[in-house]
Amino acid sequence: MSKRDYYEVLGVSKSASKDEIKKAYRRLAKKYHPDVSKEENAVEKFKEVQEAYEVLSDEQKRAQYDQFGHAGSSQGFGGGDFGGGFGFEDIFSSFFGGGSRRRDPNAPRQGADLQYQVTLEFEEAIFGKELNVEIPVEDPCDTCHGSGAKPGTTKETCKYCSGTGQISVEQNTPFGRIVNRQTCRHCSGTGQMIKEKCTTCHGTGKVRKRKKINVKIPAGIDNGQQIRVAGKGEAGVNGGPAGDLYVVVHVREHEFFERDGDHIICEMPLTFAQAALGAEVEVPTVHGKVKLKIPAGTQTGTEFRLKGKGAPNVRGYGQGDQYVVVRVVVPTNLTAHQKELLREFAGQEDKDDSLFGKLKRAFKGE
């Protein structure tokens, strides 16, 4: 089943402000919260609302979603925490009296996402490229297989929090006794303690290493876009899945080509004679040189379209065009004969063929 549009999920317009999106999210999250809602598919709807908010609350993710739809939003952007800054715990706290639901400290958790910057030449971005990148990651320790405990030993349940990862702290206040729950400092909230630590990773369960990863850059990618490589981020916690790697692409400027989405733009200088009398010229494209007929009387700023000579759409939706913008170069070092002909040209209102012929031969050195 295809995903619903994120704006439709939250019930907001595509021009909605951040505050409108946040209000819609809070309202729907409260409505479909599994602990409150009695609707049969409340869990699925709650997850759908969470996913929509995660994308639309982030400016970069939202811009990419607006451009590419669900295919673009799945690529992600940035490193570290990719959440929208207002998650499940915020909702639970604001709606249900400030006390967040206790999570299993030993439950599997996904590893952190990583970001890698890569710079491509203009043509490499047009045609795509396969790269082998080397990134620093934290992988599970091979010695203890990620447990952090010395081989042959096991973790023990924390005696201070009885494996809950939290301890209760009582406080007497003018309003009575208040019990607060805090993260257990003895086990750092894991609920387990390592009596004999692994000597390789010193009890962390992870080791820092450099990993080589093959990344396929799709043809037509543009400056600032990114590729998501699933499962190539940091190792998961407690057996959870690894995070993702996001490769952010930067494209070097070209000497005379410019990108405008899938289209390529270049400026074509023409001599006075070529522009006035017409000519056939060779135009460079990323696909090779092509011949272009310039009609007589072409002016600076005139634009010619070379169909299919642009960049391929990164999502596979066709091919862009190349636009050639004319710039007429006014001659600066004229011979006496050329000056004489131009004066004759300026003085004649009827620009007859014989004068055009003289001008053409003069400017071509014939």
Swiss-Prot record:
PROSITE patterns hit by this protein: DNAJ_1, DNAJ_2, ZF_CR
Binding residue positions for Zn(2+) 1: 141, 144, 198, 201
Zinc finger extent (CR-type): 128-210
Protein name from the UniProt record: Chaperone protein DnaJ
Species assigned in the record: Bacillus cytotoxicus (strain DSM 22905 / CIP 110041 / 391-98 / NVH 391-98)
Cofactor note: Binds 2 Zn(2+) ions per monomer.
Domain characteristics, as noted in the entry: The J domain is necessary and sufficient to stimulate DnaK ATPase activity. Zinc center 1 plays an important role in the autonomous, DnaK-independent chaperone activity of DnaJ. Zinc center 2 is essential for interaction with DnaK and for DnaJ activity.
GO cellular component: cytoplasm
Repeat region (CXXCXGXG motif), residues: 141-148, 158-165, 184-191, 198-205
SUPFAM superfamilies, per the entry: Chaperone J-domain, DnaJ/Hsp40 cysteine-rich domain, HSP40/DnaJ peptide-binding domain
Binding site for Zn(2+) 2: 158, 161, 184, 187
Any one biological process term the GO annotation gives: DNA replication
Subunit text: Homodimer.
Gene3D superfamilies cross-referenced by the UniProt entry: DnaJ domain (1.10.287.110), Heat shock protein DnaJ, cysteine-rich domain (2.10.230.10), Urease metallochaperone UreE, N-terminal domain (2.60.260.20)
Described function: Participates actively in the response to hyperosmotic and heat shock by preventing the aggregation of stress-denatured proteins and by disaggregating proteins, also in an autonomous, DnaK-independent fashion. Unfolded proteins bind initially to DnaJ; upon interaction with the DnaJ-bound protein, DnaK hydrolyzes its bound ATP, resulting in the formation of a stable complex. GrpE releases ADP from DnaK; ATP binding to DnaK triggers the release of the substrate protein, thus completing the reaction cycle.
Principal location listed in the UniProt entry: cytoplasm
Locations listed in the record: Cytoplasm
Gene Ontology terms, MF aspect: ATP binding; heat shock protein binding; unfolded protein binding; zinc ion binding
